């Protein structure tokens, strides 16, 4: 019964993630880790290398502990139950030791994570068996671990044995993630320790307006700039409910702008807009900043939002649709036509040439910006760049129309700049998990 319930819950989670264009290639189950005795294998490894030892004195007597390089607070550890109960705070020496196995033999949170981290790098000496969980999942077949060799299926990709491991866990788990790096180093795996990345992020809260719209009493957080989502307080937001609310609002806006669209098309476009609203909002802030989610801000067609970027891409697409109708020019024929177009507009020393080249050069920065985001683990630089690029295009098109430009050669060069911009913005949106609808 427990396995059935877990399976159904996971499938609903996957369906929700699929609404936001998020897919996975492997599901790992904690039960398989336990049944395959990953921890027992890792514990033997830790004992043999001396990375952990049994404390024989003080409040931690009988516990297997690991020496740690720096102190952490209970709040940082995120798991105060890891330490044995005590009436008094431990002394300085004990604060430099982290409990891995309690005196009653139970394994702490960080102990289990050590075994899992070793598996991720292919250092554990043990592996799961694998079976297909969903053959037609988003992006290809979705695999699942299994502890039963009889359930294993052939053809699984090579999971584990990673060169780099990036654990996406909120900032309150920073201390425990540091301990994982220290454990790898203590075992002699210095390279793997340096290649263990904690991609931390701050919490996501709600604006007061959004919390009220979702039906929550915000009086207890009246003196704070946001409403903290808390399971303990019973204040939570279901992702599907939020997406539904965003999609309903987006559908109303799309219908207002495109009264002739069938309901099915409106619904499909609204889902695309809702997804972009959430995904862009989640990456436009730096990782160290609390994200205060506001429905109206996320859905704005005119502010720094996913829908604004989508609209800027749709606008460029519409230009090419009308170019085809009026002048018989599409993106493929444009390249050939440019070969005979006079380059005067490109070579002129005037504001128009400066602005055209400015749009092209700004579009060309995408690869460098993405590289910066990877190096710094700060995806907000991509979001900020995409927003700036969309603004640059809107400013350019306002000053220099393409469709109504009477000079054919100038029209071609402007169209070429728009084509390059469109390709780069569409790629930037795709990197953030956002697609471009046909209308908005």
Task: Tell what function each PLM region has.
Residues 1-440:
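Non-catalytic interaction-recognition regions
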């Amino acid at each position: 019964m427990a396995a059935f319930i877990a399976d159904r819950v996971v499938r609903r989670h996957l369906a929700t993630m699929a609404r936001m264009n998020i897919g996975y290639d492997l599901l790992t189950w904690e039960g398989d880790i336990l049944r395959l005795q990953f921890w027992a294998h890792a514990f033997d490894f830790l004992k043999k290398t001396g990375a952990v030892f049994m404390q024989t004195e003080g409040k931690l007597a009988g516990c297997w502990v690991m020496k740690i390089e720096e102190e952490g607070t209970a709040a940082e550890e995120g798991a105060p139950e890891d330490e044995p109960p005590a009436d008094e705070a431990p002394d300085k020496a004990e604060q430099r030791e982290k409990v891995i196995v309690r005196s009653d033999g139970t394994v702490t949170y960080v102990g289990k994570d050590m075994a899992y981290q070793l598996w991720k790098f292919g250092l554990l000496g043990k592996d799961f068996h694998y079976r297909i969980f969903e053959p037609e999942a988003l992006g290809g077949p979705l695999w699942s671990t299994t502890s039963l060799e009889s359930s294993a299926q052939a053809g699984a990709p090579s999971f584990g044995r990673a060169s780099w491991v990036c654990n996406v866990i909120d900032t309150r788990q920073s201390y425990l993630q540091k301990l994982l790096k220290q454990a790898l180093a203590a075992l002699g795996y210095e390279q793997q320790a340096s290649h263990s990345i904690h991609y931390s992020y701050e919490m996501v809260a709600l604006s007061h307006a959004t919390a009220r719209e979702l039906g929550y009493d915000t009086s207890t957080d009246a003196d704070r700039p946001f409403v903290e989502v808390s399971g303990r307080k019973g204040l939570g937001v279901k992702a599907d409910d939020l997406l539904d609310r965003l999609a309903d609002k987006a559908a109303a806006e799309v219908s207002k702008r495109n009264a002739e669209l069938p309901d099915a098309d409106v619904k499909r476009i609204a889902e695309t807009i809702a997804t972009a609203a959430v995904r862009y909002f989640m990456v436009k802030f730096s990782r160290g900043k609390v994200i205060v989610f506001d429905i109206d801000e996320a859905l704005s067609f005119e502010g720094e939002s996913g829908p604004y970027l989508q609209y800027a891409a749709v606008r460029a697409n519409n230009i090419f649709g009308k170019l085809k109708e009026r002048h018989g020019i599409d993106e493929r024929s444009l390249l050939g036509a440019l070969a005979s177009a006079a380059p005067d507009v490109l070579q002129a020393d005037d504001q128009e040439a400066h602005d055209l080249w400015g749009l092209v050069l700004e579009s060309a920065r995408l690869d460098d910006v993405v590289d910066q985001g990877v190096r710094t683990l700060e995806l907000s630089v991509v979001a900020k760049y995409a927003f700036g690029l969309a603004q640059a295009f809107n400013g350019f098109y306002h000053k220099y129309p393409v469709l109504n430009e009477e000079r054919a050669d100038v029209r071609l060069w402007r169209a070429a700049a728009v084509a390059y911009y469109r390709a780069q913005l569409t790629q930037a949106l795709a990197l953030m998990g956002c697609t471009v609808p046909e209308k908005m």
